[in-house]
């Protein structure tokens, strides 16, 4: 298992999307640092378990990004807990978390939990609507959220989520500049090696999700692109 603070490249797999055994093998053996299992729509215990069982055939670190309490299952290396900092509904900031701890607090292995301070910035994405996120933010707003994530909440991760489209590099650069201990994760619109390399210049962790379902061959090239950039 690769420790989370060593991650540079991650693939995100959606339990609600089809992936062939051949494609899954290519993803899991690509050299990526981890696989995150997670999605927005129709994430169930059954499809989460099905995908997890297939991933576990390979020696790759696997984390569950929790979006629905009913889909939580033991066995993952880590459990990523999103807090949507720019949500306009308290449930997505702390409400769902309180409910989870109230129900499962006695059995939670706290060492496996990693909090993510999410900043959802693509207003057209399903996750923005789902989490009631205020997405019309300027760079200073994003920088403020990054500072909150590190200095007030002390989250291990601050996640810039553009979900399906590539965000402005200036936003990534400015957020990166104010973070020291908190790792900057970027996700959204990474389709090829050039995209990944550009983002890797500033983000600690590059997430490739939708791109692997659209063009697997190009998505696989992002692993080497990120690793090469981090070695410079």
From Swiss-Prot:
Subunit structure of this chain's protein? Homodimer.
Q: So what does this one do? A: Prenyltransferase that catalyzes in vivo the transfer of the heptaprenyl moiety of heptaprenyl pyrophosphate (HepPP; 35 carbon atoms) to the C3 hydroxyl of sn-glycerol-1-phosphate (G1P), producing heptaprenylglyceryl phosphate (HepGP). This reaction is an ether-bond-formation step in the biosynthesis of archaea-type G1P-based membrane lipids found in Bacillales.
Q: What EC number is given for this enzyme?
A: 2.5.1.n9
Q: What is this protein called?
A: Heptaprenylglyceryl phosphate synthase
Q: Which UniProt keywords apply?
A: Lipid biosynthesis, Lipid metabolism, Magnesium, Metal-binding, Phospholipid biosynthesis, Phospholipid metabolism, Transferase
Q: What's any GO biological process attached to this entry?
A: glycerophospholipid biosynthetic process
Which residues hold Mg(2+)? 14, 40
* Gene3D superfamilies in UniProt: FMN-linked oxidoreductases
Q: Which GO terms fall under molecular function for this chain's record?
A: heptaprenylglyceryl phosphate synthase activity; magnesium ion binding
Query: Which residues bind sn-glycerol 1-phosphate per the record?
Result: 12, 159-164, 189, 209-210
Question: Catalytic activity, per the record?
Answer: sn-glycerol 1-phosphate + all-trans-heptaprenyl diphosphate = 3-heptaprenyl-sn-glycero-1-phosphate + diphosphate
Q: Which NCBIfam families match?
A: GGGP-family, PRK04169.1-1, PRK04169.1-3
User: Pathway, according to UniProt?
Assistant: Membrane lipid metabolism; glycerophospholipid metabolism
Task: Give the family, as the similarity comment puts it.
Answer: Belongs to the GGGP/HepGP synthase family. Group I subfamily.
Read off the InterPro entries from this record.
GGGP/HepGP_synthase_I (IPR039074), GGGP/HepGP_synthase_sf (IPR038597), GGGP_HepGP_synthase (IPR008205)
Is Transmembrane helix a UniProt keyword of this protein? Answer: no
What gene name is listed for this protein? pcrB
């Amino acid at each position: 298992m690769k420790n989370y603070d060593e991650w540079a490249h991650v693939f995100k797999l959606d339990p609600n999307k089809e992936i062939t055994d051949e494609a899954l093998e290519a993803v899991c053996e690509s050299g990526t640092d981890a696989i995150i299992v997670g999605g927005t729509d129709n994430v169930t215990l059954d499809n989460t378990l099905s995908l997890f069982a297939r991933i576990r055939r390979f020696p790759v670190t696997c984390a569950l990004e929790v979006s629905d309490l009913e889909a939580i299952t033991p066995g993952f290396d880590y459990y990523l807990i999103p807090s949507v900092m720019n949500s306009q509904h308290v449930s997505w900031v702390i409400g769902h978390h309180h409910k989870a701890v109230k129900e499962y607090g006695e059995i939670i292995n706290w060492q496996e939990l990693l909090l993510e301070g999410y900043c959802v910035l693509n207003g057209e994405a399903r996750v923005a609507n789902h989490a009631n996120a205020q997405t019309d933010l300027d760079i200073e707003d994003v920088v403020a959220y990054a500072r909150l994530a590190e200095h007030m909440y002390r989250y291990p991760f601050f996640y810039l989520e553009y979900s399906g489209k590539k965000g402005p590099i200036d936003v990534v650069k400015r957020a990166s500049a104010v973070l020291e201990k908190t790792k900057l994760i970027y996700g959204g619109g990474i389709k090829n090696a050039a995209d990944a390399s550009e983002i890797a210049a500033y983000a600690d962790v590059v997430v490739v999700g939708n791109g692997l379902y659209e063009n697997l061959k190009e998505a696989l090239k992002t692993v080497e692109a990120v690793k090469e950039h981090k070695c410079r």
